[in-house]
Amino acid sequence: MDENKNKALTAALAQIEKQYGKGSIMRLGDSDVAKDIQVVSTGSLSLDIALGVGGLPRGRIIEIYGPESSGKTTLTLQVIAEMQKLGGTAAFIDAEHALDPQYAQKIGVNVQELLISQPDNGEQALEITDMLVRSGSVDIVVIDSVAALTPRAEIEGEMGEPQMGLQARLMSQALRKLTANIKRTNTTVIFINQIRMKIGVMFGNPETTTGGNALKFYASVRLDIRRTGSIKRGEEIVGNETRVKVVKNKVAPPFKQADFAILYGEGISRESEIIELGVLHKLIEKAGAWYSYNGEKIGQGRDNVRDYLKEHKDLAHEIEQKIRAAVDLAETNNRTVPPSPSE
């Protein structure tokens, strides 16, 4: 670039920064832009790996969808618990009016510090979300769920009265407002969504999510969560086998998937993942029913090894860090500390 053009560009950039604030425009190669993406762990080691960056990105919109009882709310509560461990503030917009505080507490959420709102309609829910995001003091906001964001006009209208596209228009308008503030304040906003069936689809996938197409475009990450089986101890069912597919990912290669166990009353079983991934990467040796680490036996049968790792948390952490090193994934704790409101 010649000198005159360079001077003109420098003056234009200075004027833009003066008028709209520092950081309103910058070169992509600047250190502030090119630094590692800040993330928060999902609570699942295999899902952190599948996401490619070690967790869910900060300052982005995330969509988690799946059938009923597939683990959508459990996964988001696990993310909230991980954020709270880092000293972050979390808010839960309970549009379904179905949050169980006791269950949330069991899987590690500090319910005393959790902000909760049970709005009367969709407009109120999204206005509250926008105000929390703009405050810059909340690190994660979860909306449960898009399907329950009923527009005010629909609530006030007659039962059975057609209300074409109201919810889709509401979501589209709200996401246009939210996006810039979410990025500026580095807030993670997670929308939980439900699945519906398209009528008359002969070929292809008949499934679709509620709330129109806007969320599909604005979301940086979309996760499809499904229950794939049951976990039994004897005759008793104690949990679900769960599979999450990364359907969309703007921060790493998409289309990867993660399999993990959700245990009733406990949430995602981190120890089960460490066993499975440890064996896969030859960090844990398996001979028959016995499992060994560094030549020492750590248990017979998965359940016993899981209990052993629960009791020996330092050992579990050591194996986890070796797994992260094996898949070239940095320890997320270095990149997940929430910024202070002044930053």
Curated annotation (Swiss-Prot):
<dbReference type="InterPro" id="IPR049428">
    <property type="entry name" value="RecA-like_N"/>
</dbReference>
<dbReference type="InterPro" id="IPR023400">
    <property type="entry name" value="RecA_C_sf"/>
</dbReference>
<dbReference type="InterPro" id="IPR027417">
    <property type="entry name" value="P-loop_NTPase"/>
</dbReference>
<keyword id="KW-0234">DNA repair</keyword>
<keyword id="KW-0547">Nucleotide-binding</keyword>
<keyword id="KW-0227">DNA damage</keyword>
<keyword id="KW-0742">SOS response</keyword>
<feature type="binding site">
    <location>
        <begin position="66"/>
        <end position="73"/>
    </location>
    <ligand>
        <name>ATP</name>
    </ligand>
</feature>
<dbReference type="InterPro" id="IPR020584">
    <property type="entry name" value="DNA_recomb/repair_RecA_CS"/>
</dbReference>
<dbReference type="GO" id="GO:0009432">
    <property type="term" value="P:SOS response"/>
</dbReference>
<dbReference type="GO" id="GO:0006281">
    <property type="term" value="P:DNA repair"/>
</dbReference>
<dbReference type="GO" id="GO:0003697">
    <property type="term" value="F:single-stranded DNA binding"/>
</dbReference>
<dbReference type="InterPro" id="IPR020588">
    <property type="entry name" value="RecA_ATP-bd"/>
</dbReference>
<dbReference type="InterPro" id="IPR049261">
    <property type="entry name" value="RecA-like_C"/>
</dbReference>
<dbReference type="GO" id="GO:0006310">
    <property type="term" value="P:DNA recombination"/>
</dbReference>
<keyword id="KW-0233">DNA recombination</keyword>
<keyword id="KW-0238">DNA-binding</keyword>
<dbReference type="GO" id="GO:0140664">
    <property type="term" value="F:ATP-dependent DNA damage sensor activity"/>
</dbReference>
<dbReference type="GO" id="GO:0003684">
    <property type="term" value="F:damaged DNA binding"/>
</dbReference>
<protein>
    <recommendedName>
        <fullName>Protein RecA</fullName>
    </recommendedName>
</protein>
<dbReference type="GO" id="GO:0005829">
    <property type="term" value="C:cytosol"/>
</dbReference>
<comment type="similarity">
    <text>Belongs to the RecA family.</text>
</comment>
<keyword id="KW-0963">Cytoplasm</keyword>
<dbReference type="InterPro" id="IPR003593">
    <property type="entry name" value="AAA+_ATPase"/>
</dbReference>
<comment type="function">
    <text>Can catalyze the hydrolysis of ATP in the presence of single-stranded DNA, the ATP-dependent uptake of single-stranded DNA by duplex DNA, and the ATP-dependent hybridization of homologous single-stranded DNAs. It interacts with LexA causing its activation and leading to its autocatalytic cleavage.</text>
</comment>
<dbReference type="Pfam" id="PF00154">
    <property type="entry name" value="RecA"/>
</dbReference>
<dbReference type="GO" id="GO:0005524">
    <property type="term" value="F:ATP binding"/>
</dbReference>
<dbReference type="GO" id="GO:0016887">
    <property type="term" value="F:ATP hydrolysis activity"/>
</dbReference>
<dbReference type="Pfam" id="PF21096">
    <property type="entry name" value="RecA_C"/>
</dbReference>
<keyword id="KW-0067">ATP-binding</keyword>
<dbReference type="InterPro" id="IPR020587">
    <property type="entry name" value="RecA_monomer-monomer_interface"/>
</dbReference>
<dbReference type="InterPro" id="IPR013765">
    <property type="entry name" value="DNA_recomb/repair_RecA"/>
</dbReference>
